[in-house]
Regions:
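C-terminal non-catalytic interaction appendages of large macromolecular assemblies
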Residues: 96-163
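Surface-exposed, charge/polar-rich loops and edge strands
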Residues: 14
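Aromatic-anchored, charged helix-turn/loop surface patch used as a conserved interaction hotspot
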Residues: 3-11, 20-22, 27-107, 152-163
Length: 163
């Protein structure tokens, strides 16, 4: 789909086309729709970013919690599964899996949402290092960093969707 085609869609079709880029949180796309037309991918991302930033604390926390744990063997969206496979998280050695599981649990306990990281282009070692480095952060810093990662993930997904 082209950006022009996306901009021409009615609200429901627009949300169907790109509402999934924010994991189980189509409200971002639904609100960004009114900012059409989008002259560039940057314009679309800026519109979605602006709507995300206007989200309530409850909406933002729900959006963060909608993401799966990295390296999890739980059910997840096709997009999340493909992204994690690309980073090698589907083929962790038992010790790596145990360490990632332990760090994910510590992170989730401390912050109340899963560790979020835009894994495209990253290795499993990059991800483990980032997770270890971010656990000591304060909650406010980590919420902000998690939202930055969500926006990076959404941008990658939009790049893959639009031609």
């Amino acid at each position: 789909m082209t950006l022009a085609q996306l901009s021409a869609l009615d609200r429901a079709a627009f949300v169907d086309a790109v509402g999934w880029v924010f994991e189980h949180s189509p409200w971002v796309a639904e609100r960004a729709w009114r900012r059409r037309p989008f002259g560039s991918l940057d314009d679309l991302v800026a519109a979605m970013t602006a709507e995300l930033e206007k989200g309530t604390d409850e909406e933002l926390l729900a959006l963060l919690r909608a993401h799966p744990d990295l390296g999890s063997r739980a059910r997840m969206t096709d997009a999340s599964r493909n992204e994690q496979e690309g980073a090698g998280l589907d083929s962790l050695a038992p010790a790596e899996f145990a360490r990632l599981h332990e760090l994910n649990a510590a992170y989730r306990t401390k912050f109340g949402f899963p560790f979020l990281y835009a894994v495209r282009g990253a290795t499993k070692h990059d991800i483990l290092e980032a997770l270890e480095a971010r656990i000591p952060a304060c909650r406010e810093e980590e919420v902000n960093e998690a939202l930055r990662q969500v926006l990076r993930i959404a941008r990658f997904r939009l790049e893959d969707t639009l031609s």
